[in-house]
Amino acid sequence: MPLAIFAQTQSKYIVVDQFGYLPESKKIAIIRDPQVGFDAAETFKPGKTYALVEAKTKKQVFKGKLTLWNEGKTDPSSGDKVWYFNFTNYKKEGTYYILDVEKRFKSYDFVIGANVYKEVLKQAFKTFYYQRDGFAKEAKYAGEGWADAASHMGKKQDPNCRQWGLENDASTEKDVHGGWYDAGDFNKYTNWTSDYIIYMLLAYEENPAAWTDDFGIPESGNKIPDVLDEVAFGLDYMLRLQFSSGSVISIVGEAEGSPPSSASEPSYWGSPSTSATLSAVAAFAYGAKVFKTINPSYSNKLLQAAKLSWDWAEANPNMKFYNNSAEHKTQGLGAGQQEVDDLGRFEKKMQAALRMYEATGEEKYITYFEQHYKETKMMSWSLVFPFGEYGQDMLLCYTKLPKAKPEIVKDIKAIYAVETDTINNLFAIKDHTDPYFAFQKDYVWGSNGTKAKQGNIYYNLVQYNVMPEIKDSARSIAESYIHYLHGVNPLSTCYLTNMYMFGGDKCTNQIYHGWFKNGSKKWDEATVSTFGPPPGFIAGGPNTEYNWDGCCPEGCGSKENNAMCFELDIKNLKNQPQQKSYMDFNQGWPLNSWAVSENSNSYQVQYLRLLSKFVK
C-alpha cells in the first residue's frame, strides 16, 4: 500500500532518478500505467497538471502538463503506457519531488545539484575495496557491518597457492594474494582483472577531475587519486602472477565464505596462457604510462614487466588454458570461462601493442597496430555494439595519439559514426523506441552492465569528437542510461545496493554473492538482515533468458532439493516484458538467482566510467 505523506501519497508510478539531476541537464519524470506483465492488473491514471515541489517548503516551483508517449500505445519492452513531465528548464539547486496536483500523488524526493552524483560515485567505486582479496577491511573504512580480516591467507591458500592438478607438488607454490573477487564468486580471472584496470585508468584519463583522493579507502589522503590507488592494488596482484619467463597465470580459483575471511579451502592457480599474458602486458603498460609522473620507480617496474610478458607472448602466440572444463580436466577451477577465441586473443594483442607504444614510444608496437587495425571486430564487421566495447574503445584511444595517422583516425571515426547511427543505437533513440530513454536491444545476463556500456558508446561520441554536430544530445542520451540505473525504469528500482543513506529510496536489497548470501542473518537482505550488502553494488539486471535449474521441479535428486525449486515464487520473473524480467532475490541452486541479481566488477567498472563523466 502507498505511504501517506502530509495528504500526499507516494507513488511508484511517478518515476525519477532517485539521486537527482544536474541543473543544466534534461530532467523528465516518467508517469507509468502498467498494461502487460506481473503488474498488469494495477492501474494509474494521472491528473492533468503536474508540479515540481520544493521538499522543505512544499512550494510548487514549476508546473506543467503531461505529454503522452507514442499516442498512448503500450511499450512492448516495459509493458507500460507512459507520460512525461518535463521540468528541464528549472535549474535552481535544491531538494524536490514531483506532484500530481489533482490526485495528490508524489514521487520520491531527489536533488537538483551541480555535483549530485559525487557521493554515488564514491560508494559505487568503494565496492572494489569490499571485493579486495587478501586485504583486511577495517571498520573505519568498511563500516562496522562489513569489517573483516584478510581472506584467503591461510594454509594452502593465496600466499602459497599450488597449481591446479598438482595439489601435492609443493614446488608449484606461488604467492598470488591480492586482486579482487571477480563478482559474486570469489575467483580471480586475469583476463578480466586486466579489463578492470584498463577501464579504471581510462575513466581516470577521460575525466581526472572526478577522481579525487577522498573516497574513503585506506589509501585516501596520500595525494594520489584513489582510483589510481585501487589500480595499483590490482597491478601489484598481477605482478605476482608473472613468472620469470614473462608468462602470466590465467586464473586463481578461490573458496567462498561469509564473511570471506572464513573461507578455509585451498586456492589453486591455472596454467599461464597467451591471452592472460597479453592482458597483463596491456595493464602493466597502461599503468606504466599513467604512473610515470606520479611514481617513476613503480612505472619502470611495470614497464619492465610489460616488456618481459610481451616477449613471452610473441614466442608463445597460441597457449590456451580452459578452466572449469570437463573436457580439459579442470572442472571446479573457477566458474565462468575466461579463455578467449582467436579474435579475442588478437584484440588483446592489439590492446597490448597500443599500450606498449604509449608507454615506450617504440615504433614496432604502433606499426603492428596500424597494420592490423582493420581486422578488429568493429572494422571488419562494421559493427558498434555493447558487447564489442573492448576493441571499440581501444580503437578510439588510438585516435587521441599525437602521432596517429590522419587517414586511420578518419577511418575509425567514420565507422564508429556510421555504426552508432543504426537501428539498435542512435536510430532507436531518435525514434523514441524506449519510453524510458535507455534503449537496448536485448535484456540478457548482465543487462545493467550492458546499459552502462550502451551509455558509454554514446558518450564516446563526445569524448573522442566523433560526431561534434550532436555533442550535446549525445551527452544527454548517455546520461539517460544513468537515470535508468538510478530508478527511471518500469520497476522504479535503483539498481545499486543499499543506497538508502545516500539518497536512494527503492534500492536493490539482495545480490547473489558469496559474502552477502541468502540466509545470512547479517548480510542477506538490506532492510531485513542486520546489515545487508554494502552500498553501491550494481546488480545484474533484467534477464529474459532466466530460468530455474533444469532439474526443477521434480528432478533435483531428493524431495528436499525439489522443494527448493519452490522456496520462492518466480512467476513474476518469467515470461515478462524485457524491462520487468527482474526480481530482488539471491537464492542459489536450483533457483539460480545469479543470472539476474549477481554483481560483477565488469558491470561496476562500466558504470563508474559512465557516471564519472557527470561528476566534477
Sequence positions of predicted segments:
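Bacterial Sec-dependent N-terminal signal peptides
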Residues: 1-9
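Solenoid-like repeat scaffolds
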Residues: 374-382
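Proline-centered turn/helix-capping motifs that create local helix->coil transitions or kinks
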Residues: 242-250, 317-322, 361-364
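Aromatic (Trp/Tyr) and acidic
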Residues: 14-104, 129-194, 198, 236, ...
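Hydrophobic, small-residue-rich alpha-helical packing segments that form membrane-like cores
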Residues: 281, 307-311, 315-322, 328, ...
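Edge beta-strands of extracellular beta-sandwich domains
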Residues: 105-113
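Acidic, glycine-anchored loop motifs typical of Ca2+
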Residues: 219, 223
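Carboxylate/His-rich catalytic cores and anion/metal-binding grooves
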Residues: 225-247
